[in-house]
Amino acid sequence: RQKLGGHMKYLKYLVSIVTAMSISCVAFANEIKMGRADWDTGYFQAEIYKQALEKMGYKVSGPKTMKPQVFYVAAATGDVDLWVNGWFGTHDGYISESKGKVKPVGHVMKKGGLQGYLIDKKSADKFGIKTVLDIKKHAKNWDSNGDGKADMVACPPGWGCEKVIQKHFDELGLGEFINPVKADYSASMADVISKYKNGKSVLFYTWTPNWTVGTLKLGKDVVWIEVPYSGSKAGKVPNATKSKVNLGFGADDIRPAA
């Protein structure tokens, strides 16, 4: 009951944000052309906003599923008006590239977008793994294709987090012992969950809010591991031992952009 109440408050909050912002930057249009992110955890917010806009009397087309780099270009040229899946600061560069034609408007969730790397708790405890660098000595434990490197589910091409992950790889030399898997994220995570259920070790990037850490419970099934150095203003969260973990990613604001 308490969880349901929390969900209802969240829904009311989303609708109130739409009303407050009034979509002033696209209200001149006869039709609002919506986009949505190509990660499935963004579908829910997009649908809530679409229905709220329609209740306010707007005609809404879409949402059209798009990668971030595609959305911001399309929004700058007027091919699409709005999406509610902006992650700022990860997406700050896209805003700069739009030269003022696309801007964040309102908030879905302030500082609610955490990102980072997780491994199965069993392996973390067995090998004493605290950071991504600790993977190096035990990379074969996550090697699925026999190349000697740990296979880690990462971000598909075109996602903002792909650039942050690449920065970590460049700064820390992670490519020497980790292979980033950039296939469809949902399909890759379905494979991760299947492996975990079959007793195999898993290593993956994820973010919150996300169904992945609902299925694989934080502190029970999986734990965050630290990025010991990064130029990002890294978010910190408690892990299973209540210590603080430097995630290597900033805590993003999830915001509409139009």
Predicted regions and their residues:
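Short, polar/charged alpha-helical segment
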Residues: 40-59, 167-169
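Short, well-ordered beta-strand elements
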Residues: 30-41, 58-63, 149-153
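N-terminal segment of the mature folded domain
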Residues: 69-121
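A conserved helix-loop-strand patch within extracytoplasmic ligand-binding domains
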Residues: 102-154
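C-terminal lobe and pocket-closing loops
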Residues: 212-258
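Ligand-binding pocket segment of bilobal, Venus flytrap-like solute-binding proteins
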Residues: 74, 80-84, 155-230
